[in-house]
Amino acid sequence: MSDEKNKFTDASFENCDLKNPVDRDTLKKATDEFLKTHEAEIHSEVKEENNEVSDPLAALQDENKELKDQLLRLVADMENLRRRTARDVADAKAYSIANFARDMLSVSDNLNRALEAIPEGAKENDAGLKTLAEGVEMTERAMIAALERHGVQKIYPEGQKFDPHFHQAMFEIPNCDVPDNTVQQVVQAGYIIGERVLRPAIVGVAKGGTKGVPVESGSA
């Protein structure tokens, strides 16, 4: 377009007399013709100049969007980490004594076996033996109470529907008066801590009754 500009300003117009109507009209026509001929090119140059001005703004907007996306992802990751950490801490707190509690249950079992080994009527005939038995009973109850304060719960599911997640069936008891798989006898109580089974309840279940009567398993 620079060559055309030179043509427009060449010597043929340098001697124009603007006071002369003919020259003035000639110059006006030449100017209009020039603008009409090069209007598209002029608009293109203006558009390019505008684009050059707006490009940095668009780049900044794109960069801002990318940084915002990165920030949102970082916030989401931090929130997930916070929740996972809180869950891990809660689990560690709830289950930290699980192994210790399981060992204490064995002690409780031994205390109960000791009590069961005392012959019927022996305590009534021996004051010392009676006092000893009462002391053992108190010790066993205190131990279980201490475990319960730390989240350990006893399972004694007699009369409930057998649940393989919490119960272990050792034998069947023929009984047509109750639904199949109803716990008829508890040989050994079970224990849970939180949602984990420390020890399943050892049970005997009914066999021969009607089916399909749901009885939820729970702890006593």
UniProtKB/Swiss-Prot annotation:
Write down the Gene3D superfamilies for this protein, in alphabetical order: 3.90.20.20, Head domain of nucleotide exchange factor GrpE (2.30.22.10)
Name the source's superkingdom: Bacteria
Q: Which GO terms describe its molecular function?
A: adenyl-nucleotide exchange factor activity; protein homodimerization activity; protein-folding chaperone binding; unfolded protein binding
GO cellular component, alphabetical, reads:
cytoplasm
From the Swiss-Prot or TrEMBL record, state where the protein is found.
Cytoplasm
> Could you give a single Gene Ontology term from the biological process aspect?
protein folding
Keywords per UniProt: Chaperone, Cytoplasm, Stress response
Short name of one Pfam family: GrpE
InterPro entries named among the record's database cross-references: GrpE, GrpE_coiled_coil, GrpE_head
Listed HAMAP family: GrpE (MF_01151)
Q: State the NCBIfam families in the record.
A: PRK14140.1 (NF010738), PRK14141.1 (NF010739), PRK14150.1 (NF010748)
* Role this protein plays: Participates actively in the response to hyperosmotic and heat shock by preventing the aggregation of stress-denatured proteins, in association with DnaK and GrpE. It is the nucleotide exchange factor for DnaK and may function as a thermosensor. Unfolded proteins bind initially to DnaJ; upon interaction with the DnaJ-bound protein, DnaK hydrolyzes its bound ATP, resulting in the formation of a stable complex. GrpE releases ADP from DnaK; ATP binding to DnaK triggers the release of the substrate protein, thus completing the reaction cycle.
Q: Which family does it belong to?
A: Belongs to the GrpE family.
Summarize subunit and interaction data from the UniProt record for this chain.
Answer: Homodimer.
Protein name per the record: Protein GrpE
Q: Which organism is it from?
A: Bartonella quintana (strain Toulouse) (Rochalimaea quintana)
Write the lineage as a comma-separated list.
Bacteria, Pseudomonadati, Pseudomonadota, Alphaproteobacteria, Hyphomicrobiales
Q: Gene encoding this chain? A: grpE
